[in-house]
Amino acid sequence: MMDLRREMLGDGHYFTKGDTAFYSMNGFVADKEPWKEYYAKGGSFDDYDETVFMGLISSMNKAKNDPEIHNFVIDLSTNGGGSADVLLGLISLITGEREGLLKYQSVLQGQSIDQKFLIDRNFDGKFDEADADVHYDLNFAVLVSHESYSCGNLFPSMFRDRGYLVLGERSGGGACTILGLNTADGFYYHISSYQMRLTNDAGEVIDAGITPDVELVKTGADGKKDYSDFYDLTLLSNLINDFYAK
């Protein structure tokens, strides 16, 4: 899918066409050294737009300040997961929520567990009233596929719970707590943890994947899947505009 995206959109992570901006995020990663430098020296997120999360923030700021842009697609179609901290930070920037919340279910005992986080939404190193001043007046959508795993699966669930549009195909599932294992011959693989399962706001377990609001995969006569609609920005623009016009 990365090759198809590159073929249709070109190299890079941030693309625009008409009223729609599109950012490809292959993992929920916080690059520690750039963040340390940012907090030590200040500056602009534009100075760090080659990093993952800081690059996304830079792109959201560009879209917010562009009068032609009204829609913003977060592309998780090749996102294998990463840090729940980054995920909650992104949810906070989009929704305005100053507290992040992860919802779990214990596999062993069945009880529900909530884990809360405070979010420094303006990234000034303080949790205060100024965090409420960060706004992105954009129509957001998330794009997911069978490759969207772990946090790449949790994000569309939290996104939908908040009334935002999910596009693509059923996500790959997986919990945000995963185990790395090896076979006897050295093959390394990930599985979801046996101790906790992630749930949505209704308490439903989401580890089997999230079905999109709009399915974008086409199947040819030969049975082969066609993902070209994933990266058709004109089509995505029309779908987003129709969804938020309701």
Annotate each PLM feature.
Residues 81-139, 179-180:
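Gly/Ser/Thr-rich loop/hinge elements
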Residues 169-183:
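C-terminal soluble interaction/assembly domains
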Residues 27-31, 78-84, 100, 108-111, ...:
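Solvent-exposed loop/turn segments at secondary-structure junctions
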Residues 23, 74, 140, 159, ...:
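Terminal peptide-recognition signature
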Residues 179-204:
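C-terminal "exit" segments of structured domains
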Residues 139-173:
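Extended C-terminal subregions enriched in glycine
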Residues 1-80, 84-92, 96-102, 180-182, ...:
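Flexible, low-complexity junctional segments that flank or bridge functional domains
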